[in-house]
From Swiss-Prot:
Protein name: Large ribosomal subunit protein uL29
Xref: PANTHER family: 60S RIBOSOMAL PROTEIN L35/50S RIBOSOMAL PROTEIN L29, LARGE RIBOSOMAL SUBUNIT PROTEIN UL29C
Entry annotated with the keyword Membrane: no
CC terms in the record's Gene Ontology section: cytosolic large ribosomal subunit
Keywords: Ribonucleoprotein, Ribosomal protein
Example GO BP: translation
Disulfides per UniProt: none
Length: 63
């Protein structure tokens, strides 16, 4: 997801997005641990999306 799309969302929507990404990250970590995950780059993408959402939440809280 692009940062410009995230900036248009409200803080509540961003928190919901963050929760979904954290759940997805957990599921991917479990799949990776059991050897079921073949596309390991998904972990990196989800981690970066979490960072994007957290950054925008912080910037909106300070504004």
């Amino acid at each position: 997801m692009k940062a410009s799309e995230l900036r248009e969302k409200s803080v509540e929507e961003l928190n919901a997005e963050l929760l979904g990404l954290l759940r997805e990250q957990f599921n991917l970590r479990m799949q990776h641990a059991t050897g079921q995950l073949t596309q390991t780059h998904q972990l990196k993408l989800v981690r970066r999306n979490i960072a994007r959402v957290k950054t925008i939440i912080t910037s909106k809280a300070g504004a």
